[in-house]
């Protein structure tokens, strides 16, 4: 079929949420002429649910996005109202940053960034169809009948695909926050042959700040110690005038109100069909599933400096409006609270992610990429991370360059994508530190050391960032080398000082680095014995040194595991493999291999239901069958 295109682009990104913004900024910064199409320009990078960025695992993803040259970290550092480091009492592998955002300012700042970006056109329009010829993307069709040519298309539609809002017995077609749903595109994605799933998520009510009795709640302040999501942010710019959050709880009266109205709850009445998030359940679901709990935490989170709206985290619900009011008024501190917005549930279509490659390109259609909630994830950070990788690979494909695949040992983003494309997901997927087997090397503090060189190679890390990174890396390497070269001897003068500090004396000579491996010896103590570095070191470099030195043994073990897995990842599986021709593999493994079509032995080994014997048989088969080949 011959199309008459009115405009032509290298890449078209459909949807301007957190995934779409990162995808379009990446492609345009890599030199591709890009169109970012959105149903509503006023909702670019909008936060329809929680007014926050980061958190456990998610905060590390934001650091990874920043290290690669993405935008989310820089944008939240410009627009937060509170910053807090989580899990400080635990090991470095699980520490992560979380920020309360001024949600309106966050969206405005991101829109300014997009509007100023070269090679990027921003357009309010609805895309109804993906145009495909001979298994390849050639463009898109708008609702007004315009056809735009494209060499690659990235679908980042969030919860808009056949979206339906549910509130009590009310159910109507809508995207998030009463925006337009994208119904025709949902139909056409299915017609293209993609398998579609149906998920559900929800949001809590918002209450008016001036109607809250804060005396009945517990204050939750931000941190005084400076922390940032972006490696380019300066401590001098750290916000001093932070806005606190507040903690309260449900109670038996709250639970009684919910239990008495379960018959009106869409989750239990049969109105909701989609699968909801396991790790962010509605309050009615929590009351039923955890009936033995006397109370549940609720955090009152301001949505910005210039609004009275307060987000009641932990109270996600689709109960009828009158029940929501009664529920709010049963809670300590909210007895007279004014509900400004009701909570609601939203159902939406997703593209089942086992149909994707690790580049986030669909296996079915060349040049078609999907990212974010479209792939079945939950959360702004997961969406942004996928959007960045999809955008990078769309640009690389257009330019005829090698693709970028982040491995599980490279980044949490790599863990997430591998989980999605290898295991799929039966519910909205959320990143957790427990999903990462190499989490000690995927830390908050070393994201730039892991990923900035990759960002530079693909063209997303500019000269200013690269220079700052090189300075930091050289300072780190030089100081590590110095600490490993200076020796402390068990002489009387040294041991007297060690004992004066309350520590065990030295029995053998050791390097300053070995001295620092003692749990009680921090960097400041070590340099008091061996002298300071040649130049003043930033606190973040010192933190990195302490972690790398104190956990060196564990880190080395993790790197050994990575090396073993790398050998399996390098063993490719051909696309034209005949799974039925492989004798002796288990029926379940054969079925999973056919469905997932793994690209490497490593990926095949991570598919649920596949055992080591199946992998051994597969490897023997591949060694004896050299004719097959994989190509995209």
Swiss-Prot record:
Matching PROSITE patterns: GIDA_1, GIDA_2
**Highest taxon of the lineage:** Bacteria
Q: Spell out the GO cellular component terms annotated for this protein, sorted alphabetically and separated by semicolons.
A: cytosol
The entry marks the following residues as binding NAD(+), namely: 276-290
Q: Name one GO biological process term.
A: tRNA wobble uridine modification
Q: A GO molecular-function term, please?
A: flavin adenine dinucleotide binding
List, separated by semicolons, the cofactors it needs. Answer: FAD
Q: Name one Pfam family in it.
A: SAM_GIDA_C
- The answer on whether this UniProt entry bears the keyword Hydrolase reads no
Keyword Amino-acid biosynthesis in the entry? The reply is no
Q: Where does FAD bind?
A: 15-20, 127, 182, 373
SUPFAM superfamilies found in the cross-reference section: FAD/NAD(P)-binding domain
Localization, per the record, is: Cytoplasm
- What are the UniProt keywords, alphabetically? Cytoplasm, FAD, Flavoprotein, NAD, tRNA processing
The task this protein performs is described as: NAD-binding protein involved in the addition of a carboxymethylaminomethyl (cmnm) group at the wobble position (U34) of certain tRNAs, forming tRNA-cmnm(5)s(2)U34.
Query: Family, per the entry?
Result: Belongs to the MnmG family.
User: Which PANTHER family does its entry note?
Assistant: GLUCOSE INHIBITED DIVISION PROTEIN A, PROTEIN MTO1 HOMOLOG, MITOCHONDRIAL
Subunit details = Homodimer. Heterotetramer of two MnmE and two MnmG subunits.
Annotated protein name in UniProt: tRNA uridine 5-carboxymethylaminomethyl modification enzyme MnmG
Q: What species was this sequence derived from?
A: Streptococcus pyogenes serotype M1
């Amino acid at each position: 079929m011959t199309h008459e295109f009115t405009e032509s682009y290298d890449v078209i990104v459909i949807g301007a949420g957190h995934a779409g913004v990162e995808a379009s900024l990446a492609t345009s910064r890599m030199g591709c002429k890009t169109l970012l199409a959105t149903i509503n320009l006023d909702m670019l990078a909008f936060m329809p649910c929680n007014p926050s960025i980061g958190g456990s695992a998610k905060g590390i993803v934001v650091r990874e996005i920043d290290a690669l040259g993405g935008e989310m970290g820089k944008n939240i550092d410009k627009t937060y109202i509170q910053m807090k480091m989580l899990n400080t009492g635990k090991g470095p592998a699980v520490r992560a940053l979380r920020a309360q955002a001024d949600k309106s300012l966050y969206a405005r700042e991101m829109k300014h960034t997009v509007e100023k970006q070269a090679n990027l056109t921003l357009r309010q329009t609805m895309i109804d169809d993906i145009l495909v010829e001979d298994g390849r993307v050639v463009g898109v069709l708008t609702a007004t009948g315009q056809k735009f040519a494209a060499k690659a298309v990235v679908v980042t539609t969030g919860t808009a695909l056949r979206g339906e809002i549910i509130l009590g017995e009310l159910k109507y077609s809508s995207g998030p926050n009463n925006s337009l749903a994208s119904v025709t595109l949902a139909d056409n994605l299915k017609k293209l042959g993609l398998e579609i799933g149906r998920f559900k998520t929800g949001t809590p009510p918002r209450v008016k700040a001036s109607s809250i009795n804060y005396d009945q709640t517990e204050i939750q302040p931000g941190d005084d110690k400076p922390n940032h999501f972006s490696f380019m942010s300066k401590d001098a710019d750290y916000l001093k005038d932070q806005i606190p959050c507040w903690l309260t709880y449900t109670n038996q009266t709250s639970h009684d109100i919910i239990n008495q109205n379960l018959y009106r709850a869409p989750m239990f009445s049969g109105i909701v069909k989609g699968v909801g998030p396991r790790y962010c359940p509605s309050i009615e679901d929590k009351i039923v599933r955890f009936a033995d709990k006397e109370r549940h935490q609720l955090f009152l989170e301001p949505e910005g400096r210039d609004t009275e709206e307060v987000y009641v985290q932990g109270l996600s619900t689709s109960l009828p409006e009158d029940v929501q009011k009664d529920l709010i008024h049963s809670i300590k501190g909210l007895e007279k609270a004014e509900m400004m917005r009701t909570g609601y549930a939203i159902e939406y279509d997703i593209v089942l992610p086992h149909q994707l490659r690790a580049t986030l390109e669909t296996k079915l259609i060349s040049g078609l990429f999907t990212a974010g909630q479209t792939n079945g994830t939950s959360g702004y950070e997961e969406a942004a991370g996928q959007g960045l990788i999809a955008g990078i690979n769309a640009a690389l494909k257009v330019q005829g360059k090698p693709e970028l695949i982040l491995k599980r040992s490279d980044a949490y983003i790599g863990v997430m994508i591998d989980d999605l494309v290898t295991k799929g997901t039966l519910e909205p997927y959320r990143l957790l530190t427990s999903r990462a087997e190499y989490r000690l090397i995927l830390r908050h503090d070393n994201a730039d050391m892991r990923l900035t060189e990759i960002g530079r190679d693909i063209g997303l890390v500019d000269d200013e960032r690269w220079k700052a990174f090189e300075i930091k890396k050289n300072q780190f390497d030089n100081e590590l080398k110095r600490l490993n070269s200076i020796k402390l001897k068990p002489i009387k003068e040294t041991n007297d000082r060690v004992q004066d500090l309350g520590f065990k004396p030295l029995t053998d000579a050791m390097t300053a680095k070995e001295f620092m491996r003692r749990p009680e010896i921090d960097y400041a103590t070590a340099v008091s014995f061996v002298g300071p570095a040649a130049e003043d070191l930033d606190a973040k470099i010192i933190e990195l040194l302490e972690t790398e030195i104190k956990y060196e043994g564990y880190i080395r073990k993790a790197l050994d595991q990575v090396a073993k897995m790398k050998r399996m990842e390098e063993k490719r599986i051909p696309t034209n493999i005949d799974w039925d021709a492989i004798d002796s593999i288990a029926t379940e493994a054969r079925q999973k291999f056919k469905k997932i079509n793994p690209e490497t032995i490593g990926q095949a080994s991570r598919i649920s239901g596949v055992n080591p014997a199946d992998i051994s048989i597969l490897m023997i088969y591949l060694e004896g069958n050299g004719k097959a080949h994989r190509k995209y």
